[in-house]
Design a protein with these regions (language model features):
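Extracellular loop-to-transmembrane helix junctions
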Residues: 34, 43-135, 139
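TM-loop-TM module centered on a large, flexible mid-protein loop between adjacent transmembrane helices
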Residues: 91-93, 100, 210-213, 226, ...
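Helix-loop-helix junctions that connect adjacent transmembrane segments
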Residues: 134, 170-315
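Membrane-interface "cap" regions at the ends of multi-pass membrane proteins
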Residues: 1-50, 54-58, 71-72, 76, ...
Length: 549
């Protein structure tokens, strides 16, 4: 976005090897899909969802449905922009190019920080889940092994990382399938007690559980607590935008991947919220002990594993816990990948030190990877403070950062939409056109800002003030404001005028990429022989700094 560059692109057997940002396009469509699954499904869905269940099964389900609809609209907006301009860390680049350079600086660092914080979160959760089998496993050893494995997986060529993540994410799909079948079979009587319990657990103590206060007000507080859990759990579109620059077929691959987000939300998140409320009551003693008092050594931080033990189901709890470990590891692996790529995007834009742009011959931003792994060392805090306390700190920080990211994506889209109109660009010519625009984005923006502001409201109620919880809830929001204002003042940046927003940018390069690949595949099909090396020299219009107000 800062200066014009030229790009040399290689197409070998239908694969684009080089991209404008010097990463390599090795990720196949199935790998892109599974990287997104790996990043969006992990501890939050299988373990932390228990916090929402404590507020009532109905509260949990309604909260998940409402928030999933909002994030689906965020996906709708992000898909339109990313398929149009498929570059690595897309929404970070979009923020700088279409809104304000200070806006891109802020969201880049916000996304990097909360993604990097997710790494120790997953490692700490993995260590806690291991206590299902033994309490005496040394946490320091578990943490060290995780960090080493993450380093090895991410230091390999991207195509091997993608294949690794494909199989790890496949384990998550298997786990979700097992949990769904377990729910249905046991609720109709297929359990050791032969008890067809149906939806009985919804009434224990009730579909909406009182929290903080009594009566209807208490039940409303309970719903809000479940909504905060939904805000932490339901994620996904941003991970697709991060890998857009490394997809083999940037337009066709990303379009299909973004469309798949909708059924993932419905099946995984809403389905998971429904199932957990069926198999376990909100007032289960083990659930309350683990999540309220912070006891570990039960496994059982996962509500599904607790339900299996309550029904005296043999073997299956061990299988589920083993798959849960691979699920948590997979999520952490994806977070190392995404945080290193977001930091790389910052360095390319001049928002981080230039040395971070160094890549290996295989296209891995090696110094960015080292920085991401340094954050993993925060998981050693668990040795002094305990798993549950550290998870709570990290959860609050991560949720705040996630909400900031989605707010930025919505504002990016509103500026993008305004630029299309100002430059008389017909939206019907876009490779992907979102629905209900721009009204859906406005609704999502208002909802997300309300959740961000009121996320920690409970500490302002009489007798509930806690300065530690206050800072963990609001640090990311305050930090975003400080980052934006400081960079804007320091660099004297200005908002991009809609008529001057760069809507050309990398489009010619991407169009030529796709044309080169299509031609290569046609040659293979017609001649029935291995494709020869095709080299396409093209100039990339990564326009010099756009005129600004």
């Amino acid at each position: 976005m800062n200066s014009k560059t030229s790009e040399k692109t290689e197409v070998v057997n239908g694969e684009i090897l080089h991209t404008p940002d010097h990463l390599q396009r090795h990720l196949t469509p199935r790998q892109v899909q599974f990287v997104a699954i790996g990043g969006s499904i992990g501890t939050a869905l299988f373990v932390s969802i228990g916090y929402g269940l404590m507020r009532g099964a109905a509260s949990l389900l309604i909260a998940f449905v409402l928030h999933a609809l909002v994030i689906a609209q965020v996906n709708n907006s992000l898909a339109e922009m990313t398929v149009f301009m498929p570059i690595s860390a897309a929404f970070i680049h979009h923020a700088s190019a279409w809104v304000d350079d200070a806006w891109g600086f802020m969201i880049g660092w916000n996304f990097f920080l909360f993604e990097a914080l997710l790494i120790p979160f997953e490692i700490t959760a993995l260590d806690m889940v291991l206590t299902f089998w033994r309490d005496d496993i040394p946490s320091a050893a578990v943490i060290t092994v995780c960090i080493v494995l993450y380093a090895l997986c991410n230091a390999l060529m991207v195509k091997y990382f993608g294949e690794t993540e494909f199989w790890l994410a496949g384990g998550k799909l298997l786990l979700i399938g097992i949990l769904f079948f377990f729910t249905f079979i046991t609720m109709v009587g297929g359990n050791p007690q032969r008890d067809a319990y149906g939806f009985r657990n919804w009434s224990k103590p009730g579909p909406f559980v009182e929290y903080i206060d009594d009566g209807d007000l208490g039940r409303f507080h309970g719903f809000l607590a479940a909504l905060w859990q939904a805000a932490f759990t339901i994620v996904g579109p941003e991970y697709l935008a991060i890998v857009a620059g490394e997809a083999q077929r940037p337009r066709t691959t990303m379009k299909a991947a973004f469309k798949s987000v909708y059924w993932r939300f419905g099946l995984f998140f809403i389905g998971g919220a429904l199932c957990v409320g069926i198999v376990l009551p909100a007032n289960d003693p083990t659930l309350l002990n683990v999540l309220s008092s912070g006891e570990t050594g039960t496994g059982a931080a996962s509500p599904f594993v607790i339900a299996m033990k309550n029904m005296n189901v043999e073997v299956l709890p061990h299988l589920v816990n083993a798959l849960l470990l691979t699920s948590i590891y997979s999520a952490g692996n994806a977070y190392v990948y995404c945080s290193s790529r977001s930091l790389y995007g910052l360095a390319l834009n001049g928002h981080a030190p230039k040395f971070l742009t160094k890549c290996t011959k295989q296209g891995v931003p090696i110094y960015c990877l080292f920085v991401a792994l340094a954050f993993a060392c925060l998981s050693f805090l668990k040795l002094g403070s305990g798993s549950v306390k550290v998870l709570t700190w990290l959860t609050n920080l991560i949720t705040g950062g996630t909400l900031v990211t989605y707010i930025v994506i919505c504002i990016n889209y509103l500026f993008f939409y305004r630029a299309l109109k100002a430059q008389s660009f017909d939206r019907s010519d876009l490779p992907y056109r979102g629905y209900f625009q721009p009204y859906g984005t406005w609704v999502a923006l208002v909802w997300l800002m309300a959740v961000e502001i009121f996320y920690g409201y409970a500490i302002f109620l009489r007798g509930r003030w806690d300065i530690g919880i206050f800072f963990s809830n609001y640090t990311m929001g305050f930090l975003a404001i400080c980052l934006f204002c400081s960079w804007k003042i320091l660099k004297r940046t200005q908002f991009v005028r809609p008529e001057h927003a760069d809507l050309v940018w990398i489009r010619p390069a991407v169009d030529e990429h796709e044309a080169a690949m299509a031609g290569n595949e046609n040659e293979v099909g017609l001649r029935r022989r291995p494709a020869q090396l095709v080299r396409v020299d093209m100039k990339l219009s990564r326009a010099s700094r756009s005129p600004r107000v």
